[in-house]
Amino acid sequence: MSGTNPGEADGGAADAVLIAGPTASGKSALALSLAERTGGIVINTDSMQVYRDLRIITARPTPDEEARVPHRLYGHVDADVNCSAGMWVADAAAALEEALAQNRLPIFAGGSGLYFKALTRGLSAVPPIPSQVRDDVRARLERDGAEALHAVLARRDPAAAQRLKPRDRARIARALEVVEATGRSLTDWHRDGLPPLLPPDKVRAIFLAPDREALYARIDARFGAMLAAGALEEVRALAERHLDPLLPAMKAHGVPALMRHLRGEISLEEAAEIGRADTRHYAKRQFTWFRHQLPEFRWTSPEEAEAQLSCVIPGPR
């Protein structure tokens, strides 16, 4: 696999390991294995696995797996919270400080590119906006109009709303995208950004890149396994809370389709196929995003990943 990593440092030990990759590529299992071998702490770097209500449908580590080594930032946020990248960075900073204070290797594992980017580059003054947030805001713009979104912006970012005319469609949408994606106003981002948590030359960063067809087959099989493990009941409990459908937890892959099934709109088989297709499309986007946004990550097959990490971290710390 191609790719370079500024943190390789002639085989020296890294201050932290970053394990990224598309959904269902084996990141959690690799992180668990590495943590057991090194006495490390696994730190969640996935925007959906932070939610307490969604263990099954987001493929969080099982309670047994979490008991084997310390896990942080898994299921620590309620579904009624919009956990922004800025909130995650603050939580990740505390988890990183804990790991280093205990002389444990911090192992960041997940699939959220913006979170990994924040670790080694910080959050920029004008952060990249996830396509899901952007598409949602643009759909609301078409449905409700610029003046309605301007009223929403006045509550979320009053300073930006005051600067913008109520019919300035593009700038209103941009300001609202930023505050909804990050939890910080565009005004704040223009003033300052968040610094990186880790020096890029002191980390070992890999991207698990399985064979595409094998990955898609695994995604399809895993969705069926989730249903067998109780994913529908998990989503039913979430639906009974009657939360805002625009909250991130309500849009996790598989959740909207299963909620449609619970409302009697589609069959369970149709919901499962929609969930599988959405997850496959997400995996494709993850490949593309990491290739262009974080080229310093070393791409490797899951089979080669253990050896890649063993070269840098030969034994317990």
Curated annotation (Swiss-Prot):
The record marks S112, R134 as: Interaction with substrate tRNA. It comes from the Bacteria. Monomer. Transmembrane segments: none annotated. This is tRNA dimethylallyltransferase. GO terms for biological process: tRNA modification. Belongs to the IPP transferase family. PANTHER family: TRNA DIMETHYLALLYLTRANSFERASE.
